[in-house]
Amino acid sequence: IGPAGEIGVHFACIVNDKHRAAGRSGVGMVMGSKNLKAVAVRGTGGVKVANPKAYRDAALESYSMLKENPVTGEGLGALGTAVLVNIMNQSGGLPTRNAQTGTFEGAEAISGETLASSYLKRNKSCMGCIICCGRVTKISDSRYGGDGEGPEYETLWALGAACGISDLAAITKANYICNEFGMDTITAGSTVACAMELFEKGLIKEEEIGMSLKFGDADAMVKMIELMASNEGFGAKLAQGSYRLADSYGVPER
């Protein structure tokens, strides 16, 4: 786990292989509450296949099916899970401005197509997987510089459309911060989106947080991600997730 799990961020996750996260349900916070930093396992045995030929035949059949499928053979390999951004937006299912609507006017700017043509360095595959939908990215032409893995589809809508943000560099930077601190990007982005709606409805005041927090403000979104990772000040409210944040202002339905 990262610093977020150690200090009690409710949506802290368990990270393995540098950037791969067991992101949901706050399992990183559970480990942190037990003063458990990591679990390391090294196997000593092997796996014996009962019928090697049948196993190989089944594997080749699965390989062919995956390669011939337009989603697993083309879309995911070329654009990663971010291939879903434009698809979901066109179907009206892309959570936008804290899910007040399902269509985002800036979807193309945060799509898999745009990511592939701007910050993608190379694809990456999970062990044994032929789809190779992982994204290794680097930002060098923006003040939001950095490098790492992602963002995935869920991260793009949570830190992007849900916050009204079409700045792909800012979204990718916030994703890097979440990875480094060990925070679930879905809850992190959804919590910022909730805070933005509460701010625009006048429930959260600028005097309380020391800055404006409107939908579409990329700098404010990145700052909120940094605050929640610290679990201090207003960040301590953010670190409890969207439901508890909204409930603290008397509107848990937000």
Model-inferred region functions:
Residues I1-R254:
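Intrinsically disordered, low-complexity segments enriched in small residues
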